[in-house]
UniProtKB/Swiss-Prot annotation:
This is GPI-anchored protein 13. Residues 434-456 form a propeptide. GO terms for biological process: filamentous growth; filamentous growth of a population of unicellular organisms; fungal-type cell wall organization; negative regulation of flocculation. It comes from Candida albicans (strain SC5314 / ATCC MYA-2876). Induction: Induced by caspofungin, tunicamycin, during chlamydospore formation and during cell wall regeneration following protoplasting. Repressed by NRG1 and TUP1. Also regulated by TSA1. Residues 1-23 form the signal peptide.
Length: 456
């Protein structure tokens, strides 16, 4: 007769073997989760079993549903949570490859405080609220379009979409990357009615906030805000086409200044970043009439530069290419005794300086009035630069000499032209409006020598 200990040992070995086999092949695993006041919606007739607990003793309870309804079971309930773990290494690799090719949607749980959401039409919300380390679902019926706010800790799902794996032919296409940036006092302008959802944070806890915008307006969210920022990734260098190309690019960089001053000739909206104690946040300024805008303190404002890069292949174009760059550059100018004529009522904001200290000064002018300020004034000086570029090349095979790009940057009143001189052929560059240059008399001298030789 077999001993009981051997039977127990055999059962244990079989149990361990079966559990390891299940884990290896990635079967579905069901885990028990204890909740309070279990709530679920049954869309059709069904029968399910849950475990209810009283005084640390749990027993199964069968619930029969004959029609579509919402079931609420009070007390402590143990309900199943189903998860599918990954299988073996080869199965994981194949699944990962297929998900990269086709893309997938991953849903995770995020705990937030004071959950807020907007329901545009009648519906029923089911969320999970937590208190004293115990979580239970809460059902909220919504009859009309409204904004629902649930106070306290709430567990809400967050969905993330993974993009499909790009093939080699699609690797050169641009990719849009969205990242999260934490700012203080978030400001944005909404030209059309819309709904904004941002995450506001307090004491290291963040929760979403929905803002309804019905008319064109500027929205300011005080405090710490997590907002998305979008950037475009350029294609890889290896996938660039080899045919002749001309690239026109505009590069915008941030320049840090103190007491930023600019003149707006027409109604517009200016967005700059003001900084205080190593923290920067965007500031939106609405300009309704032609005026001078002064932003005191440390300001990061955009600075734009334009570049043209022309590459030549084995067969250059028959006719030269003519390109024109035009840019408006605004620089501060210091004047003593500022005078200007205001044909219409307006408000002028100037920066006056005294004893090496400058501060904004506001002057209100009526229509048809000449305003004079006998002091040292810092005013913006705007000028337009226009550079016309002609690029032509001789017929030189690309295999003998790689093409050297010609870069022209129009960022100041004196156009700066920088060229790299190749050893074989130098592209001919002419700039309209530039000073006259001396022509190298090599060709004329050779012609003169030939004439003298023919005479003597």
């Amino acid at each position: 007769m077999r001993s009981p200990s051997l039977a127990v040992a055999a059962t244990t070995v079989l149990g361990l073997f079966s559990s390891s086999a299940l884990a290896y092949y990635g079967n579905t695993t069901t885990v028990a989760l204890t909740t309070t006041e279990f709530v679920t919606t049954c869309p059709y007739p069904t029968t399910f079993t849950v475990s209810t607990c009283t005084n640390d003793v749990c027993q199964p309870t069968v619930v029969t549903v004959t029609e579509e309804t919402t079931i609420t079971i009070p007390g402590t309930v143990v309900c199943p949570v189903v998860s599918t773990p990954s299988g073996s290494a080869s199965a994981s690799a194949s699944a990962g490859a297929s998900s990269e090719e086709e893309g997938s949607v991953v849903t995770t749980q995020v705990t937030v405080t004071d959950f807020t959401t907007y329901c545009p039409y009648p519906t029923t919300l089911t969320i999970t609220k937590c208190e004293n380390n115990e979580c239970h679902p809460t059902t909220i019926p919504v009859e009309t379009a409204t904004t629902v706010t649930v106070t306290g800790e709430v567990i809400c799902p967050t969905t993330t979409s993974t993009s499909p794996k790009e093939s080699s032919s699609e690797a050169a296409s641009s990719e849009v990357i969205t990242t999260q940036v934490t700012v203080t006092d978030y400001t944005t302008y909404c030209p059309l009615p819309t709904t904004i959802v941002v995450s506001t944070c307090d004491e290291e806890k963040c929760h979403p906030t929905t803002i309804e915008v019905s008319t064109p307006t500027t929205v300011v969210v005080p405090g710490t805000v997590v907002c998305p920022t979008t950037s475009v990734a350029t294609p890889s260098q290896s996938e660039v086409a080899t045919k002749p190309t001309t690239i026109n690019s505009v590069v915008t960089t941030g320049v840090t200044t103190t007491d930023y001053t600019t003149y707006c000739p027409s109604p517009t909206t200016i967005v700059v970043s003001t900084c205080d104690e190593e923290k920067c946040h965007p500031t939106t300024i609405e300009v309704s009439t032609p005026t001078t805008v002064v932003v005191p303190g440390t300001v990061v404002h955009p600075s734009t530069s334009a570049t043209i890069i022309t590459t030549t292949a084995e067969q250059p174009p028959a006719s030269p290419e003519v390109s024109t760059i035009e840019s408006v550059v605004t620089t501060p100018a210091t004047l003593t005794g500022y005078t200007t004529y205001c044909p219409e009522p307006t408000t002028i904001v100037l920066t006056t300086c005294s004893d090496d200290q400058c501060k904004p000064h506001t002057v209100s002018a009526t229509g048809g009035e000449t305003v004079s300020i006998p002091a040292t004034i810092v005013v913006p000086s705007s000028h337009t630069t226009q550079v016309e570029i002609t690029v032509s090349s001789a017929s030189v095979p690309a295999s003998e000499k790689p093409t050297t790009p010609v870069t022209v940057a129009a960022v100041s009143s004196s156009p700066a032209v920088s060229t790299e001189t190749p050893s074989l052929v130098t592209p001919a560059i002419s700039i309209a409006g530039a000073a006259a240059v001396n022509v190298v008399p090599t060709t004329a001298f050779g012609l003169f020598a030939i004439i003298l030789a023919s005479i003597f």
